[in-house]
């Protein structure tokens, strides 16, 4: 995966673009970054998504019993991990809807350590436990995980259920730590965007606030209301990231309003309802 762009690199690159814009145009609009963690790609799949009956939960817990009660305390005793990390790594399923087990690359990688003494675990088990923990309510499970959770990692092994016996890969989870990094970077980027808009007397759009309106009740238009709900909200396409035609029409109106307000223009807004969106049908 790519690292998050350094805030100084971002500022320098955007400053070059704004300089080029000023050299070739008499105005423009800068748009800040919305809270990407509030789009359907990150909000549709619930963190608690693994249904288990009492017997299955007990059977799974039995498989993790030695890990919880012996391996983790020993690693704390050996100062390989902290008590706090050991607590985060505990696995416990119960009757009802459970949090899946996930791989978290911010945890200490135990895959090699567990293959040596005193654990002496076989490589497949050690690798499985290497950065494993159970998800929490604060983790964001990505939309593509909906087609992965509950399936078999190995079709020939009926016990290799992803989220129960095999961790969901890190790429399909945005952990709280990663969310913090995104928030920090976004705040720095947005400060740069707003500063450059002011310094260069350009129109400015607060897309972050606009998206917040979609997630907090929606935005009314003639004929309906746009929200950030997946499929039914009308704003986002099936990938959960890009807008629908109707969503893009709303974005166009936001930009038009900013241009008209800043430059005294009279660009007409579009009728959002004239543009299509996802249609749910039983046919």
Residue map of PLM features:
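Active-site-proximal beta-strand/loop segments in catalytic clefts of secreted hydrolases
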Residues: 1, 31-35, 207-210, 241, ...
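Conserved, well-structured beta-alpha core segment at the onset of a catalytic domain
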Residues: 1-63, 250-251
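Soluble non-cytosolic domains of exported or imported proteins
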Residues: 4-12, 180-187, 242-249
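Structured segments of extracytoplasmic/periplasmic soluble domains
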Residues: 13, 17-20, 24, 192-203, ...
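Surface-exposed patches in mature extracellular/periplasmic domains of secreted proteins
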Residues: 30-32, 197, 201-209, 263-272
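Acidic, Ser/Thr/Gly/Pro-rich low-complexity segments that form flexible
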Residues: 42-199, 207-231, 246
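Histidine-centered active-site loop/cap adjacent to the catalytic His
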Residues: 228-280
């Amino acid at each position: 995966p790519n690292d998050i762009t350094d805030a100084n690199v971002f500022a320098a690159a955007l400053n070059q673009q704004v300089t080029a814009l000023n050299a070739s145009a008499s105005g423009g609009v800068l748009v800040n970054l919305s809270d990407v963690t509030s789009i359907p790609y990150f909000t549709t799949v619930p963190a608690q998504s693994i249904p288990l009956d009492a017997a299955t939960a007990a059977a799974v817990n039995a498989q993790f019993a030695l890990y919880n009660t012996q391996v983790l305390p020993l690693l704390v005793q050996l100062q390989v991990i902290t008590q706090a990390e050991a607590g985060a790594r505990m696995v416990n399923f119960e009757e009802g809807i459970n949090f899946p087990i996930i791989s978290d690359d911010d945890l200490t990688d135990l895959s090699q350590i567990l293959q040596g003494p005193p654990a002496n675990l076989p490589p497949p088990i050690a690798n499985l436990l290497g950065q494993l923990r159970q998800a929490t309510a604060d983790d964001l499970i990505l939309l593509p995980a909906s087609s992965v959770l509950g399936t078999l990692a190995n079709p020939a092994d009926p016990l290799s259920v992803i989220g129960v016996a095999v961790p969901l890969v890190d790429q399909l989870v945005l952990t709280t730590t990663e969310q913090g990094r995104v928030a920090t970077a976004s705040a720095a980027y947005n400060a740069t965007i707003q500063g450059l808009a002011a310094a260069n007397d350009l129109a400015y759009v607060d897309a972050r606030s606009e998206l917040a309106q979609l997630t907090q009740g929606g935005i009314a238009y003639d004929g309906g209301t746009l929200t950030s709900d997946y499929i039914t909200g009308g704003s986002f396409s099936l990938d959960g990231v890009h807008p629908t035609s109707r969503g893009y029409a709303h974005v166009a109106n936001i930009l038009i309003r900013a241009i008209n307000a800043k430059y005294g223009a009279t660009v007409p807004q579009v009728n959002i309802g004239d543009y299509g969106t996802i249609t749910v049908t039983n046919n």
